[in-house]
Amino acid sequence: IEELIKNNIQFDWTIMEESGKASGNELISPLLLSHRRLMIGDHKQLPPFSETVVNSILERDSIDYSLLIDGISNGSFKTNLTRISGLDELSELMQSDELDNDTIKQLNQTIKRIFTKTKTHFSLFKHLVETSERLNINNSSSMGDLLKIQYRMHPNISKLISSLFYKDQLINHKETENKYLDITTKPFIFSTNDHFPNINSDKGIVWLGIQDPNKYNFLPQEKDYTNEFEAQIIIKSLELIQSKSQLNAENNKPIKLMVLSPYKKQVDMLNSLFLTHKTVEKIQQKGFCIAQGDNLCKTVDSFQGGEADLIILSLVRHNTHTPIRKALGFLLDARRMNVMLSRAKYQMIIVGSLDMLAWWSNDSRAKDSEEFLVKMTNMLIPNSIQAKELEICHYIPIAYQNN
């Protein structure tokens, strides 16, 4: 791209995918290659790299101007930037005896405005989408729109995603919806046993629920961002799964399967266990294939843009430590949860403690600040009014077994 810009090469169109994951700095170069630009992405999924770090710096209440000036004047940005930005004048002002409280106050206000613009430019795609949405509301000419029709997933899954993240705006493609609602088209089944009664549900979401950590007498299974009990459940479920190609020779297309977890340590542990149990070889013999790459388990971040016929999720977190962000961590990151919950086509099996999420969602601190968590729990927890109305999730309680 650098060479194209240097040689003043122009195209009729520039099309950029995954624009929501790119920072404004990364988008500038391709934007310069044409006067017509199409940006495709989802700002409600994974953000640009280091967005959280950048925002934490820009949102600080106090500013150390000496560090700011030194970093730009003497750091890797040195050249003409100091002169053309006016930082040389700011440096002289900071070292003079004329710096009074009014000047500092005015300086702070100016810097805050600059930082606000910097945040906007760093998360450029998000800013453009939100601007477009405001224009649509005001019936003004808009520069963008939401792609509302979804073709990928079971309508139960899309209902959850649409309600949690997209203001109930997603629409299921009719033929796709009918295909997923017809359980005979699902290309896999499970051999039932006492571990997972009624696991062959027609629901697009199945939750294998570990009991509430407040209600048992053994130590929590979560340890250092791993959860061995969840891993045992996943191993067992993969032993029981069968492809319908084994039962029907006409259907011999490999079924894509993937296990996801928010935490790298859990991913590493699961992949190690899969090697020990020869899980990949066994599922391949039964007509399944890994949806992406060589490892059956991946982190959520590494699977954005991916999809599989069946997704199994390991949530890991299983405690009631305070504060809430220490207890739930990743599970409170709505954008990453959006990615995790929207990868499955036919079915998503979630392994984790829904009781724990319900416990937290009933906590006043969560109700005040964690709307996403409360809403998701109410849609999925058995016996809640909303869950009974929606009927999108089949819940199977799993009793702890100390193997």
Over which residues does each language-model region extend?
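Conserved helicase/translocase P-loop NTPase motor core
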Residues: 1-12, 232-236
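Conserved ATPase-coupling elements of RecA-like P-loop NTPase cores
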Residues: 2-5, 19-28, 48-51
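SF2 helicase catalytic motif II
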Residues: 8-23, 38-39
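Catalytic acidic motif of RecA-like/P-loop NTPases
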Residues: 20-21, 44-45, 301
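Conserved P-loop NTPase nucleotide-binding/switch module
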Residues: 30, 34-66
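Helicase C-terminal subdomain and adjacent C-terminal extension
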Residues: 53-142, 320-403
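Conserved helicase/translocase motor-coupling segment
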Residues: 162, 168-272
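Conserved helicase C-terminal RecA-like lobe
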Residues: 240-258, 265-342, 354-360
